[in-house]
Amino acid sequence: RMLYAAGGEIGSAILYHAKCICDTIRDEEFVYGHAPINPAFNHDARIISCDRLVDWVLYRAGFTDQPYIHGKCVSGPWLTDWCLEHGFTRIDTVEELLPGDVVFVRPNQNGDPLHTFIYAGKGEEEGMHYRYDAGKNERIRSTQPSCEPLNDFICACRAPSVRPIAVPALSFTYGGTPFDQLEVTAKCEADRVIYTLPDGVELTVVTEFLQDYGVTRWTNHWSNPTDRRSALIENLCDCDLTIPMAPDPARTRRNKQYTWEPKTLRLFISDGANINDHDHTVTPHRMWAGDHKEVCNQAGRSGMGTAPFFEVNEGGDHRNGMLTALGWTGQWRAYFDRGEADFRIRHSLPEVSLRMAPGESFRTASATVMPYREGQVNAHNLWRRFIREAVSPMGRFKGERGTQCPFSAIFWGGIPSDELMERWQGILSHGLDAFDYCWVDAGWYEPLRSTTTATQSADWGNVGTWEVNRFYHPKGYRDVTDFLHERGMKFQLWFEPERMRRSVCEWTDYLWTGSPEDNDVLIDIGKDEVCDQLIERISKVIAEVGVDCYRQDFNFNPLATWNRADRDADPNGERKGATEIHHINNLWRFWDALLERFPHLLIDDCAGGGHRIDIEMLSRSVPLWRSDYQCTWDCCPEVNQNSNMRAAWWYPYSGIGYGPTLGDTYSFRSAYTNGMTVRTWEHADPEWRVGGMNEPFDWAKRYFAEYARLRHYFAEDFYPLIPPSDINTTWVASQYHDRAHDSGLILAFRRAMCPYEQAHVELGGIDRRRNYVFTNQDTGESFTVAGTTLLADGLVLTIPEKRQSLLLTYETV
């Protein structure tokens, strides 16, 4: 008899595996007793008990971080506590039980359970209940589920609504043998499995399941505690995951047309920051059974070329799918394969082919996966909340590093301190007090002496000393930061410590291509002693200057340099990838050290403008200059509209630059995202001083204040009402909704050649029980619409003139 849970996917999975396992233990003549090994890992002994059955069933349902030896015992109450620690809900009455619950009965003298089983539903007779139970030989030999009275009930545990991903979901070859064919031992701890490979090398898979978001994360850590080199590690995929997906629909002519909304599976791949009109574009790729696709980044920078964030959507009604993130700040490659009824995802480090040295240890890429069943928009909003609350340093540290990205005015580092403060006096005297940061970019360090915009723009790349230039800043910038802090503002300072110019300063060990003409070199941060030197060198500047936001650039493509260092280290080619791995590990260690030393510090991840945006960097920083496209003078507003909407699909926190020209509301609002820096007074020449461009200060006061007041919404839930487009004859519109306060904004643009005065949109996040008052931020006019009306009819937006914007805020009444 087969029973399924009426309301839960995981409950159904638990019942399915319970039935299969109970049939197996009956047919293979298992006996009751204490198994020497958790049968979820190895059941060759054919010994089973009540708790080992539950262990085995839960493992098959995806709860894999279990002890290898013996398993979780029911007494103690070890199994009960384990369930609650893993997001199960405690059930305290028999009347509340649902099929798939783990039931605990027969209390001992301490009140702890002595017996457990899988509940399978109420029986036909009063007081009788179905169960899967291996508590004695008679039950093991029977056909289950059995129907028995439920006596001495203590409690039950119900699995969370989102199934965890079964890990370890990784693959590699070791000495030519695939991981799943190696003779290994496994030791399970609370959040990790430690595998000991045949030669003593240890692989530790650390896992985390975040129930609030349905996210599973894991990282793989390698250690060679032996006195000899390891076998060759190759074909390393830190994520190798196959997930069930519905079979393809029939291959009809219509389903092959790209103008038709397909019911086929789609893989969504995002562009990185490539300094062009298409930055962060998300492109769907239809994949039929047998199709294969692979993508990679460029030149060793994780967000250059292709971004390491992916989505697979099942097809059909498009409600089911999975979001994934590859956590590696170096070179990566991703492979995707469509099966008949499944989909395989692999995240690899393609450069790795190495033997570990004695005593060597490192970690490789992390994997983050989030299955979803409520559609793409809901999934990406849950992802945004996950990044905002559980990943980003702003969310994780509960506001110690701020709660929003900065609103800044940017200045070149060669503007003398006295003049910089004079410019700020001018900015503030015109009522432009919405800024919360002064952003100082390149050019503030020794040995520079240039005094014009042209020469400073040419000389800034002479880096390496990381000493404040006393020619420009006699007091070492401390007078500037004191000035700012007294006025409630903060100070952001640019660095590029991984690159060093040999003609300037050879302050530490470095790597290079070997060419005498190669003046820019890569410091050898992969060496622990170099990393330690860097931590001290940069920490000294942060402390002495009073830096609030540390901005790290990286104008260097490191892959070729890493590969040369690997060849130099081992001409036999058995250390490929080692230099890169240690560089990335110590880059993370460097940032972690700064965050630990300076609890207030925010880190800005630049890397040539968005070239290293990955989930590992997002866990330590925010990208405040998302693309060097913003280096373009008064860059195209439509590109900013598109870029902001495309990036919002994955990142709640990010920023771009604007300007220098002020006065165009359409263009300025096109730059609205969670962080912005204004370029109007950026450079050294006199025309860049406050008032030098005849700035419209009244306009600036109004719209700077508008942006600062509404900025927080751009980190909330995002709804693409009219998707981004590369044509100029359309509208684009987005909604940002604050779930906690049931308020938000709608930002819409009618482009320059668009003939339509009105657009009809369907809003997200609306509560049918509430009424919403909308306010036009240009006219001040308000109107009220019932939630039921908004959900039934949507909302009509009106922009009377071409190349104009509409900004509506709303709240409940």
Indicate where each model-derived feature is located.
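N-terminal capping segments
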Residues: R1-Y68, D112
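...with weaker cross-activation on analogous glycine-rich loops/strands in unrelated enzymes
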Residues: G8, S12-L15, F63-S142
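Polysaccharide-binding surfaces and accessory modules of carbohydrate-active proteins
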Residues: P164-E340, P350-V352, N771-T784
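Active-site-proximal substrate-binding groove within the catalytic cores of carbohydrate-active enzymes
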Residues: P168, Y174-D180, A186, L587-S782, ...
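Short Pro-Gly-centered flexible turn/kink motifs
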Residues: L354-R373, R803-E811
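Aromatic-lined carbohydrate-binding/catalytic grooves of carbohydrate-active enzymes
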Residues: G402-E536, V545, C549, L559-T561, ...
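C-terminal beta-strand-rich structural cap/linker in extracellular carbohydrate-active enzymes
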Residues: A786-V813
